Amino acid sequence: MNIDIVISADHIDEKRLINKTVIIIDILRATSVITTAINNGCKKVIPVLTVEEAKDIAKNSKEDIILGGERNALKIDGFNFSNSPLEYTKKYVEGKTVVLSTTNGTRAINNSFNAKTILISALINSKATAKAIDKLNEELIIINSGTNGQFSIDDFICSGYLIDCLYNIRKDLELSDIAKTAHYIYTNNKDIESFVKKATHYSRLKSLNLEKDLEYCFQKDIIDVVPQYKDGYIIKSNI
């Protein structure tokens, strides 16, 4: 199995994604939010690029809609929830549709529509994602959402952990140089949160007193669900 990594949403070459399996990672915090919401019974998540698009969907939909997301890590005015996974509890999201717009994660998803299969991953569901990847048995591109178009340490080391989970299932992995680097960094820094504490995005969230979000997002494999983007929205994968 060939595995490569794209370091940010801005670095996505859509033509490269054709007939590939793509994994979207934005552990701080979009893919952690999506995974948590789906695990808590959310009917589906609709990832959108703009605030206006999100509000239009909510206005015109007959479904029970929750608006969630952030800009520069802050809750969007008029939205129900921010980009904190701790807000998307079963009490609030079960049976409902979440329309989500974030600075990095939803942009990475929307830039990946050419892929054959799009799965959503974070630290909280990496082992489950690895099992799904193994079943698909296709060429894999791991897309790090990054931070404002730039490389992000947190997404990169999460990619390394996902590769490590895959190695525990199968040994026939052919890694690109950047994928090898991600795996090496993880295997030498398995206490992920300690490693990324000096990262730009981590520092930004900590400055906003979001330590509980950080603590939650850096847990490994607390959820055995893999969200999948298909036909315009994200649902629980049956892979």
From Swiss-Prot:
The enzyme's main class, written as a single word, is hydrolase
SUPFAM superfamilies hit by this protein: ComB-like
Extract the InterPro entries matched here: ComB-like, ComB-like_sf
The coenzyme or cofactor needed here is:
Mg(2+)
- Catalyzes what? (2R)-O-phospho-3-sulfolactate + H2O = (2R)-3-sulfolactate + phosphate
Tell whether Magnesium is among the UniProt keywords.
yes
Q: What is its EC number?
A: 3.1.3.71
| A Gene Ontology molecular function term of the record | magnesium ion binding
The yes or no answer to whether the keyword Zinc is present is no
Give the family per the record: Belongs to the ComB family.
* NCBIfam families membership: PRK00886.1-1 (NF002052), PRK00886.1-4 (NF002055)
Report what the protein is called. Probable 2-phosphosulfolactate phosphatase
Q: Which organism is it from?
A: Clostridium botulinum (strain Langeland / NCTC 10281 / Type F)
Q: What is the lineage of its organism?
A: Bacteria, Bacillati, Bacillota, Clostridia, Eubacteriales
